[in-house]
Amino acid sequence: MLLLCSMNQKRWIAVFWVASVFTLGISWITTPRAQAFHTGQAQETDTSITKRFVMGQFFPERDARFMIVPSEIASKSMWLQKPVIFAFQKMARAAISQGIELKIISGTRNFWQQKAIWERKWQSNTPMFGTGIDNAKHILRYSSMPGSSRHHWGTDLDINSLEPGYFRAGKGLREISWLRQHAGEFGFCEVYSPRSTGRLKGYEPEAWHWSYKPLSNQYLLYYLSNVKYEDFNQFYGSHLAKDLRIIEDFAGGIDCK
């Protein structure tokens, strides 16, 4: 009799242990972190933000957060953060089902790539605008100072065309109308919206420029809190950053918060 009781107790202990493990396993799988792991999706919180990163002083090909954008959604080879690519793929599939084709034409640019763009324009404009603040203001209509571009972050991308007129009629108008109606469902927002929306500071409107908010809002908050004007250096006109209020009016002058 004693032996039978002992055997029954062992069976009940074994059943209880298996049930407990099963319950814990189900609980783990249904947590957000486990779901992200199970589905292969990256976490939306970046815990490794640094000043060098938000100012573009890194190489995306050496950063595990980044990957090459698949060719079916890109016009050329470029890098973006993985969650941005996954979200854009979902958005592109939804768009194509409604007859709208979305292609990424520009992705991540680090500090040195942005410096090359800035200094090429600076030198090209010098005969007309000189080497002072007027030159910088002209460039800043559509291009960022190195160290202040949202393209540094791997969260921002340009879609389909860089010509303002493209989005005013026909195919381009249908595309921008679809984006303004649906992009928010996938985490994207229009950064430099029309002036008519009340955005009076910063760059000219860019219908093509969209940002993945779940990550870019983290970087913007860090940028506005940590980047100082003495951090701007090593390019033509860097000494003008404070006079131009690059941090407050350009980095902060957006409709995507």
Locate predicted features:
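N-terminal Sec-pathway targeting helices
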Residues: C5-W17
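Bacterial N-terminal signal peptides
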Residues: F16-S27
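Extracytoplasmic cell-surface/polysaccharide-interacting catalytic and binding patches
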Residues: G25-K257
